[in-house]
Amino acid sequence: MIIKPRVRGFICVTTHPVGCEANVKEQIDYVTSHGPIANGPKKVLVIGASTGYGLAARISAAFGSGADTLGVFFERAGSETKPGTAGWYNSAAFEKFAAEKGLYARSINGDAFSDKVKQVTIDTIKQDLGKVDLVVYSLAAPRRTHPKTGETISSTLKPVGKAVTFRGLDTDKEVIREVSLEPATQEEIDGTVAVMGGEDWQMWIDALDEAGVLADGAKTTAFTYLGEQITHDIYWNGSIGEAKKDLDKKVLSIRDKLAAHGGDARVSVLKAVVTQASSAIPMMPLYLSLLFKVMKEQGTHEGCIEQVYGLLKDSLYGATPHVDEEGRLRADYKELDPQVQGKVVAMWDKVTNENLYEMTDFAGYKTEFLRLFGFEIAGVDYDADVNPDVKIPGIIDTTV
C-alpha cells in the first residue's frame, strides 16, 4: 500500500516502515561516524527500547560499544492492510542492522510493568546472555496495571497546588492559545507517581538482582527531564514532577544495591526533544519550536541519538561525567545555557499566529514530529508501494 501521514491531535495514526528503517539507519550512521564508546557496555537490557531515547540507547550501545542488546517494548505489528506502530518498525530495522553486524539483538513485546514480562526477560537473559552489565529504563506510559494489586492507574499532566494558565500551541490548527489547567487532586498525584515514578524501575532491578542476572559492576540509568523555569509550573512543579522526584528518591536504594557488586545507578537528565510523549504536553510544542530556533542558530541543536550517545560516551562510561549536586548525570546543559533560555523567554510572549513561522522553528518541529512515524526522511520514496507487514524474527511476543 501507499502510506501517507494522517495526523490526529498529537498522534500520527499512520506509520511508514521504510521511513522508520531509514530513520534508524541515520541514527546508526551517526554513532558509527563518531567512534566507539571506550569501556562501554557489552550486554544491555533496554526497557522501553522501541522509540525516542530508549531506541537511541539501544543503537548507541550496539553500534557504539558492540553490545548485545535485549529490548522490551509494547508495540503492534502491521498487517497487509494496516500499518503497525513506529516502534515495531524501528525495532525490526534495528534487529536487521544488528544482525548484519553480527550482534545479538532480541526483543520482548509486552507490558513491561507486568511480572510476566519481567520473568520472560530474566529467562531470556539466562538463556541467551548469562548476565547484563547495563539496564536502561526508558518507559513512558499513560497508565500502569500494578502487578501486585491488579489496579490500573493513570498518570495526569496537571499543576500541583494551584490552577495554571499558560500559552500553548495548537499544532492541528497552528494557532497560539491560552491553556488553563486545574490543580491535580492527591489521588491524581499519587497515580502519576505510581505510573511515572521509580517504583517499577526498582521492581525491575530487584527482580534482575534476585535472579542473579546482573553482572558485577552493572550500571543502570533511568531517563528524566527537568527543564527550566518556563516549563516548571506544568512540569517539574506539576504532577509529572512529583513522579520525577520519586525517581530521585528511588535511585538511592537502587544505587546502594548495585554498589554492593561494584555497580552504580543514576538518573540521567536529557534535553527536551519531540517525542510522542512530549507532544501531548500542552506547552511543549511552543517551547520546542522556540528552543529549536535558538539552538539551531547557536549550532547546539541535538536530537535523541546525539543526546544518548553523548551521555554514554561522556558520562555513563566517560572519565569526566557531567554530574549535578543531586548525583544525576546531565546531558541537558546546552538546553539550560542561560543565553538559550533567556532568548526563549524573551520570545515566548511575542509569538503570534501571524509570526509563528518566523519567530519559531515550528516547521522544524513538524518535520521532527513526522519523522517519529517514518515520514519526512530524506531519500525515501513516499509514492512507492510498501508492505506494512514487517516481521521481527525471533521476537518473544507475550501479548498473543
Curated annotation (Swiss-Prot):
The keyword NAD applies. The keyword Transferase does not apply. One of its GO terms (biological process) is fatty acid biosynthetic process. It catalyses: a 2,3-saturated acyl-[ACP] + NAD(+) = a (2E)-enoyl-[ACP] + NADH + H(+). Monomer. NCBIfam families: EnoyACPredFabV (NF043048), PRK13656.1 (NF010177). HAMAP family: FabV_reductase. This is Enoyl-[acyl-carrier-protein] reductase [NADH]. It comes from Burkholderia ambifaria (strain ATCC BAA-244 / DSM 16087 / CCUG 44356 / LMG 19182 / AMMD).
